[in-house]
Structure formats: C-alpha cells, structure tokens
C-alpha cells in the first residue's frame, strides 16, 4: 500500500496507467492492501484520506490495479512468524512486518512474481539488507540489537530472488520511457521535483539517492 499511496498522494497515479500501456506490466494487489488503501478510508468519519482512496478505487475499477484473492494464509503465517523473530531488543522480539506487507510477500512467493512494489523502509531492508536494518534499528532505538540467525536465514530463503521496487524507481522507469516528455525543456526538472514530492509523500529515499538518480538520467 505504501507505494500506491505515495504515487497517488503525489498526483502521479498515472505512472501505473503509463507503465501498463507501455510495458504490459500487471499490478496485482492483495485484499489487505485494498482494505487499507480503499475500504478503511472510505468508511471512517475522518475524510482526509477519502480523495486518495477514491483515486485508488478508480484504478481498480479501470483494471490498472488488479485485486487478487488467493489463499496464502499458510505462507503469511510463516513469513510473519519468521520476520518478527529476527531482531530482539532488551530480550524482546521486534514486530517489524504487518498484514499488508506479509500478504504481498506471500502472494509474490505463491504466484512466483519476482518484484514487489513497496516504499516502506523496514520490510524492504528486511528483504534486501537485513544487517543494515539491524544497524538502523540500533541507532533509532539506542539499544543493542540481537539477531536470531535461524530466523534470519529462513527469511532469506523465503524471499530469495524477490526484488523490491519503490515508487521513485517506478517513476524513473516511466520517465525514461517518455512519461514526462510533454513538459518539453523542463522535463528533467519536473522529474527531480516529482522525486522530492514522492519522498515527502512517504517514500523511503534519501536526498543522496535522488541526486544519484538525476545524475544517471539524460
């Protein structure tokens, strides 16, 4: 849900339409993500998130985001148990991953999908660089972090070959294919501004990474 929300809040939801048209990519979302992004915001008194929820619902109605209701409960239980018993602080396990991320990972594993779209830092680092996450947690919590090597190894086995794509990377791919070409001579400036907007919308990306992105594009 994090990447969908980032792109929607940054008024960049048409990245999904563009990439689907240009590449034939499929964007599959599990039911828990629909619940978090659409159903919950539409059925609470606070209407602050209603506009974003309706835009996401429109993408589902248009077939751009395709909902998947597969029985991945067994895989979810295993991923949640393993993922939340890797790191310990003061002798207690740190609960790091939740229903949305767990279901998405389980669905990707079940359907043999190589990439997941995710802006949330903790789960991404848990997949890509768990020891970097350990250092981050130690600095954030100001305590020593212990590692359950058995759970860590199991998580690496469960997510082997799984790639994580952030909303910023989806934007850069779309940019390289002409998504922003209608801006003519300010196209690159718009791309950079959009990356900063995605960062402020919730994508876990550093200023250094944005600079590196912009150096790598024409």
Q: Regions from the language model: what does each represent?
A:
Residues 2-114, 121-218:
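Active-site-proximal, substrate-binding regions of enzyme catalytic domains
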């Amino acid at each position: 849900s994090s990447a969908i929300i980032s792109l929607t809040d940054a008024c960049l939801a048409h990245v999904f339409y563009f990439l689907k048209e240009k590449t034939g990519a499929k964007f599959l979302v599990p039911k828990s993500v629909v619940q978090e992004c659409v159903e919950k915001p539409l059925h609470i008194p606070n209407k602050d998130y209603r506009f974003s929820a309706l835009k996401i619902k429109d993408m589902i109605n248009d077939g751009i985001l395709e909902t998947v209701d597969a029985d991945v409960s067994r895989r979810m239980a295993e991923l949640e148990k393993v993922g939340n018993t890797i790191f310990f602080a003061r002798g207690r396990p740190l609960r790091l991953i939740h229903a949305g991320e767990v279901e998405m990972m389980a669905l990707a594993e079940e359907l043999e999908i190589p990439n997941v779209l995710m802006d949330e830092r903790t789960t991404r680092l848990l997949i890509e660089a768990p020891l970097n996450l350990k250092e981050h947690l130690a600095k954030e919590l100001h305590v020593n972090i212990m590692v359950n090597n058995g759970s860590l190894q199991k998580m690496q086995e469960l997510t082997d070959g799984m790639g994580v794509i952030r909303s910023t990377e989806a934007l850069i791919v779309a940019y390289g294919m002409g998504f922003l070409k209608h801006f003519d001579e300010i196209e690159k400036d718009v791309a950079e501004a959009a990356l900063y907007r995605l960062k402020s919308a919730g994508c876990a990306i550093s200023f250094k990474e944005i600079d590196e992105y912009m150096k790598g594009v024409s």
